[in-house]
Structure formats: structure tokens, C-alpha cells
């Protein structure tokens, strides 16, 4: 009889560990999903900023080296 109780206790402990691991896995999965969402958003922002920078570089705005120096008073 004590052996059966021992086995039941071990099974209960293993079930608790599995439940904890399943919960941890679900939390990690959700964190990964959230991070992927943030990463996707950041990639879109980076593409937008790169496009804007390219537009600015190709515009008719002179660079600082091309600007004529201001008159000295």
C-alpha cells in the first residue's frame, strides 16, 4: 500500500511539473508573438525612414559643403 501512495505522489508531482512547463511554454510563446509584432512594426518604420531619407538626399536641397558661406560683417 505505501508503494501505491508513493507512486500516486510521484505522478501528482510530475503532473504539476508538466502543467507548470505548459504554462511557461505558453507565456514564452506569447512573449515571442509580442516581440515579433514589435519587430515587424520597427521594420516598417525603418523602411519608411529610409525612404524619407532617400527622398531628402535626392531633393534639390544643397548639402552644407555646397552652400555658399555667409557674408562676414
Swiss-Prot record:
InterPro entries: SlyX (IPR007236). It comes from the Bacteria. Gene3D superfamilies: 1.20.5.300. Belongs to the SlyX family. This is Protein SlyX homolog. It comes from Histophilus somni (strain 129Pt).
